[in-house]
Amino acid sequence: YEKWFKKLGSGWGAAPSVQIIVDNSLIVMSANHIYKLDLNTGDILQTGDMVAATNFGYTPPTYADGMIFAPLADGRVQAFNAETLESLWVYQDTLKGQSLSPITYSDGYIYTGFWNAETKDANYVCIPVTDEDPTNAQEAKEAAWQYTSLGGFYWAGSVVRGDYVVFGTDDGTSGSDGTGHVLSLNKKTGEVMDSVDVIGDQRSTIAYDKETDRLYFTTKGGYLYSLKLKSDGTFDKDTLKTLNLYDDVDGFNNAAGLLADK
């Protein structure tokens, strides 16, 4: 059963992005445009112009504080008014790169990372969201801080816990068994509070489970990890648990146990 469909462009470069729902409307990016569609009919309600296309379309926009933040090619993030889809500002990263990491919002700032290549540097950044120059639709935004890492950041969505933001890095090699890192930084200053080594590129959003008070994440090397973050922003490394999903023939059952373990 197909209720409606809407063609937004042609060719793989215009493939629709992952969508989000904002105020009972569907937000989707395609080619160099961002659209607001009616959920029931698919009619285009608003259209906004983006300064670049997305990278493959699988990193969705993020909504927060009345704004939509679009991850775009060449290390760009563009902010839009969520009601009108008018552009508010544009961030251009100093090292550029593909915008492949989900955008996280917390207390007036967004956090995201970029990727250039397996063995090249890229930045993870904290960007203030305030529209400081409402007269300039493409106001050039600057990062509050940036963290540079060899190998960059790929699917590396962050989680904010209190005053700290936690995210992971690639391992800086072309294989899958190098040493990546999961980092805890002061979310306002970018000061590194702690780091834990992981096997392979850390390529997942960091998840937090309130019941177990644990962080969970995976790596390209085939590992599932779990550990706790202390109130001072350092990791409780005595709580670190690791599961090799490739080698463990009973991996799914053990993963369930790891997820349930407090």
Spans of model-derived segments:
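Aromatic (tryptophan-biased) beta-strands that constitute blades/sheets of beta-rich domains
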Residues: 1-15, 38, 43-54, 86-95, ...
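Repeat-blade elements of multi-bladed beta-propeller folds
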Residues: 6-35, 52-78, 98-125, 146-182, ...
